[in-house]
Amino acid sequence: MPANASPQRPTSVRSPSLPKALARAALLALLGLGAPGAAQQPQPPVTEEVPPPAQPPLPDRRVFFTTLNVVRYNPLGLESQNRLVYQKRLFDSPSVLLRDTYASAAASLKLSPAFFKLGPVVEVQPLAVLNLRAGYEYVQFFGTFGSIQSYPDAFQPYDDDLRSATNDTAYGTSGHHFFVEPMLQAKVKSIALRTKLAIEYWNVSLHDGGTRGTFYDPTLDTLVPGKGWVLANDTDLLWLGGKWTLGARLSAVWPRYDEDATAVEPLPGRKLPTNQHLRVGPLVAYAFDTRPGGLMSKPTVLLIAGWYLKHENRVNAMPYLLGGFSFSTDLLSGR
């Protein structure tokens, strides 16, 4: 063997070791680059939980217009109820009990072919289950459509036929109407229950009766004291199904007359009437669009029927009927 063969052997042994090391390093690098991205990034702690997305908060301030337009039968009536409202959120809380809380002030206008009512209304909802509304209305009767007709006391017949026969005695006048309306409400899943008590005081200039004078009011459908109190209640049991609302309403009215009115003697064989009434029946509402905001927000049609369980003039098969249409318009809304 040539003399230079021995030095070539170690060279042949050492020279391939470097390429093998480089190849091994390259292979490890390739394996590292080919690993999944999740394996390259630190994992979050096992105990960490992602919070659910929070519901968008209610507007902190809101200005809106709302209107309800109704037509009634038994008794007959037509009325447009309108309010311009400034509303302020009370609590910025995710709590179900505190989230939908607010205070508001509004200018209210009610229009009818027989009258208008104008005045301020304040409303506060400190809890989702409690609402309180109070207001004042200046009332102007036009003397049209048989309104108003007044009586010397609370014990006069006032059914539709009699009032129609005495339409010529109707006259225009004005007065004042104060009211406080506490309401309790609750909702479990799709079932809601609410009850509203109206405490009203009337002071109307009448031609008859002095302090015992009364007048017929078609909204309350009873003889209202010219200077005195009326209590009313609406209780609704509702099923809320998206755009549909189905349920039942119980309504009652209790006029409160001056104590000396009991001095009036009834006709022979008749008892002194209380002019209270009670009715119950179905309620159906459909909202064409339930999304808030916009020029015409939540346009809704409403139908109510009520059979009289108690009434001086209307305990028969013909129910009270009401059809209505409501919507609101957001004018200003800010967080």
Where are these regions (language model features)?
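Transmembrane beta-strand segments that form the barrel wall of outer-membrane beta-barrel proteins
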Residues: 61-72, 100-113, 120, 132-135, ...
